[in-house]
A protein has these predicted regions:
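Histidine- and acidic-residue-rich, metal-dependent catalytic cores
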Residues: 2-159
Length: 159
């Protein structure tokens, strides 16, 4: 879903400071840039909407890009899953987001609950709250797991 960030690595993860307005504008272009990559192969067509819509709000009234209507996508539920996961990762990881401080898992869950129905799919938020094993695993990943996950990706795909 974030393949478009490959085009903007000079903006992302570079400095220990807040992003400028221009840098934020460039980062907001990554869904469209990602779509360009995916259009190279017809086999990737089913990923177009999730790449384009993973920063749109559940209710379609916020997020970006403005001209994409996630509420009409046949892949809406997948967009909702990727959106929630992306927000959780962005908020809790310490690796690769030098421009902001990570949040606690509890704070992120509070934000997900607060945004349920507007920004996030309420059924997905409820699912996390209703399944203790899922909640605990997500909490473990948020607190300890990102470096291990990145190392596994490196071991399996980059070497």
């Amino acid at each position: 879903h974030d393949i478009g960030k490959n085009s903007i690595v000079s903006v992302v993860n570079n400095d220990y400071r807040q992003l400028s307005d221009e840098e934020r504008r460039i980062i907001r272009m990554h869904p469209r840039m990602g779509l360009k990559y995916l259009k190279i192969s017809k086999e990737l067509k089913s990923y177009h909407d999730t790449t384009l819509g993973h920063h749109k709000w559940y209710n379609g009234k916020g997020g970006y890009p403005n001209d994409f209507d996630n509420t009409k996508s046949p892949y809406r539920f997948m967009i909702d899953i990727i959106t929630l996961c992306d927000c959780m990762q962005a908020a809790t990881e310490r690796v690769g987001r030098n421009y902001k401080q990570e949040k606690s898992f509890e704070k992120v869950m509070g934000e997900l609950r607060e945004g349920a129905g507007t920004r996030y799919n309420p059924d997905l938020v409820k699912l996390i709250d209703d399944i203790p094993e899922l909640y605990k695993e997500l909490e473990r990943i948020a607190i300890y797991g990102w470096p291990d996950i990145y190392y596994e990706i490196y071991k399996n795909y980059m070497r």
